[in-house]
Structures are given as structure tokens and as C-alpha cells.
Amino acid sequence: MRIILLGAPGAGKGTQAQFIMEKYGIPQISTGDMLRAAVKSGSELGKQAKDIMDAGKLVTDELVIALVKERIAQEDCRNGFLLDGFPRTIPQADAMKEAGINVDYVLEFDVPDELIVDRIVGRRVHAPSGRVYHVKFNPPKVEGKDDVTGEELTTRKDDQEETVRKRLVEYHQMTAPLIGYYSKEAEAGNTKYAKVDGTKPVAEVRAALEKILG
């Protein structure tokens, strides 16, 4: 089962990716992890990636596709894989197709921007333990304090409203066109495309995914 997850940052992909990995026994492939592993391994592709990153440039689509091909040929991907954060653009999706990387399901997590802003901006973290709260959906017992230690909670830089809105603009410009791309691919019988209502509670989203994936 080869799956691509689409959706804006904060749409709940991470939570459900965990569930899909456990239920279907497939690994999640993130391009960031893949690049780090390739550089660490010192492979030919890793060396190329390191040179590009050391020069402060963006790794080319060709190189990322080559890394994806190498990664999915590994034993743990025998039953499939879950791609999150890639492809991000139509040229990347085209390059994947040309490289013969076929996908069984493309799942779009649909959540309105304002709800995403609400979800992310309301997050508060206790940095030492990694505990995460939300002012509206999962508040601490005492406002601004960690339940266990009573220490101050903080807001991550990435969770500030300005940053979140900027990331959403980027998503709509770069990645949202993939929704049309994969809808057409599904019409042509090349993949299955499903839109998931990401505003629903976690358990309901999970049940919807089970129904789609079987």
C-alpha cells in the first residue's frame, strides 16, 4: 500500500500517519529524514546532497527522487510506504511518475485555514518534557503552567500566528495544485483519491481512513 498524504501544516496528518503506519505496517518516508540518513551514510547520493546543502542551496528534485527510489527499494517498504511532505509541487509529482513510483492512495486532509490557525496558535508546550497543551482544546489545569511540574509553558516560534499564516500561503501556492493533479490521475485510473474531513475528532478521522484503505 503506497500512500501520499496531502494537507496544510496543522491539518492533522502527523497524528493519522502514526495510525496508518501501525495499522498497515508501512514506514513513513519523510524527505528530511531521508536526506539526513543519506548524508550520514556517506553514499554517492548522500555526498551529492551534502555538497548542495553545504553550499546553502536547495536539493534538486532529481536528487530527491533518486533518494526516494533508493529508500522504497529497502526491505521495510516491501508492503508499501507513506509519503508525507513529498511531492510538494506538480513538477515533483511528474518526476515521481516518470521514475515509475506509483501510488495506490492519495489522501487529502481538508481543514479550513482559520481552524488551522486556531489549532496551531493555541498550542503551548512544556519544553523540558515535550508535553503539549492547547488553550482551547486541551488546556492545562492552571493557565500557562505545566500540569506535572507547575513550570511555565511557552509558545514555539513555529506556532506564532504570522509564521502559520505564511506557511499556509506557501502551501496554497505550491502544494494545493497537487489536489487537482491527483484528482485527474484518479479519474484516469492511475490512483485512488480521497478527501478526508480533518475538522472531525481524531477517532472519526481514523474510522474514515479505515473505510477508505480497507
UniProtKB/Swiss-Prot annotation:
Keyword Calcium carried by entry: no
Location of region: NMP: 30-59
Listed pathway(s): Purine metabolism; AMP biosynthesis via salvage pathway; AMP from ADP: step 1/1
Binding site for AMP: 31, 36, 57-59, 85-88, 92, 156, 167
GO cellular component terms attached to this protein's record: cytoplasm
Similarity section: Belongs to the adenylate kinase family.
Quaternary structure (record): Monomer.
Catalytic activity, reaction form: AMP + ATP = 2 ADP
GO molecular function, one term: ATP binding
Protein source organism: Escherichia coli O127:H6 (strain E2348/69 / EPEC)
Record-given protein name: Adenylate kinase
Keywords: Acetylation, ATP-binding, Cytoplasm, Kinase, Nucleotide biosynthesis, Nucleotide-binding, Transferase
Main location: cytoplasm
UniProt-listed GO biological process terms: AMP salvage
Record Gene3D superfamilies: P-loop containing nucleotide triphosphate hydrolases
Domain notes: Consists of three domains, a large central CORE domain and two small peripheral domains, NMPbind and LID, which undergo movements during catalysis. The LID domain closes over the site of phosphoryl transfer upon ATP binding. Assembling and dissambling the active center during each catalytic cycle provides an effective means to prevent ATP hydrolysis.
Region annotated LID, chain positions: 122-159
Sites of N6-acetyllysine modification: 192
Chain's role: Catalyzes the reversible transfer of the terminal phosphate group between ATP and AMP. Plays an important role in cellular energy homeostasis and in adenine nucleotide metabolism.
A family per Pfam: ADK
Gene giving rise to this polypeptide: adk
